[in-house]
């Protein structure tokens, strides 16, 4: 009986430790925009002005602007990522960007700075590998992005690729991401 109780406790503790939950607050709903900006300080100011506008601040959105050193498939120099708590907040964030006065001013400033959007595919699949730890906590990653015109044909290829990398120690940190760009 003692062995059964200890075994049950051990199995339960492994389950609790290995449940692979994302950290609290990690968002799986994201809008990511890549672009080319030759004047980073002015691009950052335009982004900050947008994020500090009253109609945006009141939403308490979480966002990052970052430099892109080399992504291997276009000339993007910077990116902006918005992180949402739910699909509803994701939809609302995109609606506010399109319909608000702050969004209009931000888009106008983007045009004035001649910022060139590089995210022009409707569907992009990203394969990412993190350096160590969970993808949500890691600041270093390697990503390949593919323009996929037929997801039904792509899925068997993805499954084969996923199976082929299982032999590598970093495979537990690899992930696939389907992105839908709502515009550039």
Which ranges hold each PLM region?
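Non-cleavable N-terminal signal-anchor transmembrane helices
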Residues: 1-4, 98
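Short S/T/G/P-rich N-terminal loop/turn motif that feeds into the first structured element of a domain
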Residues: 18-184
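Sec-dependent N-terminal signal peptides
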Residues: 3-13
